[in-house]
């Protein structure tokens, strides 16, 4: 019996040792480019909340590369893979549990592994107004094999300061008189 325990312990140790190889390929999940926006009025009402009487949901579309995308409330989920692959969902209204505002619009996702000079995204607002959002992305692999990525977003040609650290999350205020105005850090 003692010999059997020793044999099993030895085989288990051998299996654990063999499973601890350091020569596996590293698969880097590069964060995708995704624009997320929150829109309020001057009084702080969430203009993307369907329960708010003056919401903008039905009046918003996005034009991108000769296509127009209306606001959708559901998206198709793709099968998980070992490496994260970005999936383009179009313009999605979603409820956020971790954001200062309850509802937001997400447009994307785009591959973060491409260097892009500048691409425009036109947000079509009520009354025929438009806000020109744009992004540029630089990406390269460092000599040690790690990815280096930098994404910058713009509103009407002005660079936006990312509210949550390079993830494309921005807060705006909308009025019929002034159009869309950027609100740094989601403050009024």
Show the residue positions of the predicted features.
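Extracytoplasmic cysteine-anchoring/structural motifs
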Residues: 21-29, 33-34, 38, 71-188
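Bacterial N-terminal signal peptides that target proteins for export
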Residues: 1-8
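Surface-exposed loop/turn and secondary-structure junction residues enriched for glycine/proline
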Residues: 4, 50-51, 163
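C-terminal motif of bacterial Sec signal peptides marking the signal peptidase cleavage site
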Residues: 16-19
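N-terminal export/targeting and maturation segments
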Residues: 21-70
